[in-house]
Curated annotation (Swiss-Prot):
Alphabetized HAMAP family for the sequence: GTPase_Der
Alphabetical list of PANTHER family matching this protein: GTPASE DER (PTHR43834:SF6)
InterPro entries in UniProt: G_ENGA (IPR031166), GTP-bd (IPR006073), GTPase_Der (IPR016484), KH_dom-like (IPR032859), KH_dom-like_a/b (IPR015946), P-loop_NTPase (IPR027417), Small_GTP-bd (IPR005225)
Residues where GTP 2 binds: 182-189, 229-233, 294-297
Record: residues binding GTP 1: 9-16, 56-60, 119-122
Family designation: Belongs to the TRAFAC class TrmE-Era-EngA-EngB-Septin-like GTPase superfamily. EngA (Der) GTPase family.
GTP-binding listed as a keyword: yes
The protein, known as: GTPase Der
Molecular functions per Gene Ontology: GTP binding; ribosome binding
Residue span, EngA-type G domain: 3-167, 176-352
Length: 437
């Protein structure tokens, strides 16, 4: 399980720019307008052999500054409670503001490592101006420029030097771990209770009554798993109104330590933005995935087209990752709950699939010959053969060709789709690599 780092700060100090710099991506939208980060951005960072998870907490305003400040305070409080280390970003050009002081006051109360980061220090002349941030009472400011990258290497060095070794509480026995994930109050604990016939987890109508990730051994009907409840939220009064960010942080912890993820969504709401956020986290962690539409018993006036309509809506929202099993179930009535575990076992087995090299080439090379990679700037790419890598967590394949750099994402997606058509790879991501031969 990785350490989690949260970036917090008032609007327009460069949180998303720093997030993009550290993750070497353009995942977070960056704009001069305040509040452009409306969804919680999540990614992984690798530095000097250390991998950690990072979250851009964003921040946006609705109607008034007071509501905005309240929202920021909630997110900072959640970060304090759930993240391992906090990067508190301030703006050296505009200096200390009242909102900076409010956030600093919240951070000083907790026994959590806070690294004060003075952003927009694009030249040495601005370094001296960061001295005013000592008044925030959070130690030495690290001068960085997220826009050009200066100082970020030193920041990462200091960051990883303060990581604690994460100990996963998953039992050591080699049994697949299934994380049941989803936004608060979709029925995660109810599903585990229904499967085990035990009131192992506290269940109420209040979102977030599960207090910790709980590993429950399931050993029935020839199936053996550890079921992991992702804990909804563990709310303190001061953060009770903001469950989305909290539940996503908790989901990250369980997703990273699982083999298969069951993403529960609420049938009465279909698939929402928060469901897509968690879906994306599962994809980035390359976990097996099953989507379960819970509370199906609450849908009235169902007809033969109802399931098709729901399934089509889900696949449109999750595209291009559409090769995912979808099960319509009810933890309350126990309808199709055991099918969930049967499919989970199938997905787990698919992740272990080994396809002979001869079979791969016999099927794929004629397809490639019929639909070769596009000619790029007069360069003709010729794929010569393909083989599967061994000792990988998910099915991974290497295509040997003369010009690997000229094969772009759309053609890789074409190859993936062809592989999914010819081999049952439902529910698991696959890796496709190009190598020169």
């Amino acid at each position: 399980m990785n350490n989690i780092v949260a970036i917090v700060g008032r609007p327009n100090v460069g949180k998303s720019t720093l997030f993009n710099r550290l993750t070497q991506s353009h995942q977070a939208i960056v704009d001069e307008e305040e509040g452009t980060t409306r969804d919680r951005q999540y990614s992984k960072v690798e530095w000097c052999g250390q991998i950690f998870s990072i979250i851009d907490t964003g921040g946006w305003v609705l109607n008034s500054d007071d509501i905005f400040e309240e929202e920021i305070n909630k997110q900072v409080q959640i970060a304090i409670e759930e993240a391992d280390i906090i990067l508190f970003l301030v703006d050296v050009i505009h200096g200390t503001t009242d909102l900076d002081q409010q956030i600093a006051a919240l951070l000083r109360r907790e026994k959590k490592l806070v690294i004060l980061v003075s952003n927009k220090a694009d030249n040495y002349k601005l370094y001296a101006q960061s001295a005013e941030f000592y008044a925030l009472g959070l130690g030495d400011p690290y001068n960085v420029s997220a826009i050009n990258g200066s100082g970020t290497g030193e920041l990462l060095d200091y960051l990883i030097s303060n990581f604690t070794k994460k100990v996963d509480n998953k039992p050591e026995i080699t049994i697949p771990a299934i994380a049941i994930v989803g936004k608060p109050n979709v029925g995660k604990s109810s599903l585990i209770n229904a499967l085990t016939n035990e009131e192992r987890n506290i269940v109420t109508n209040i979102a977030g009554t599960t207090r910790d990730s709980i590993y429950t051994l399931y050993d029935k009907f020839g199936l053996k798993f550890y079921l992991v409840d992702t804990a909804g939220i563990c709310k303190k009064k001061k953060v009770e109104e903001n469950s989305e960010y909290y539940s996503i942080i908790r989901a990250i912890r369980s997703i990273e330590s699982s083999d298969i993820c069951i993403l529960l969504i609420d049938a009465t709401q279909c698939i929402m933005a928060q469901d897509i956020n968690i879906f994306s986290i599962i994809q980035k962690n390359e976990k097996g995935l099953i989507i379960v539409v819970n509370k199906w018993d609450l849908i009235q006036n169902k007809n033969p087209k109802t399931i098709y309509t729901f399934e089509n809506a889900i696949r449109q929202r999750t595209a291009p990752f559409t090769d995912v099993p979808i099960i319509f179930s009810s933890a309350q009535t126990k309808k199709r709950i055991y099918k969930i575990l049967q499919v989970a076992k199938e997905v787990y087995d698919i992740r272990q699939i080994k396809i002979p090299t001869s079979q791969l080439n016999r099927i794929l090379l004629p397809i490639i010959a019929k639909t070769p990679p596009p000619i790029n700037k007069g360069k003709v790419v010729r794929i010569k053969y393909v083989t599967q890598l061994t000792n990988t967590i998910i099915p991974s394949f290497v295509f040997f060709c003369n010009l690997p750099k000229w094969i772009k994402t759309p053609y890789k997606r074409f190859l993936e789709n062809q592989m999914r058509k010819n081999w049952k790879l439902t529910g698991t991501p696959i890796n496709i690599f190009m190598r020169e031969k």
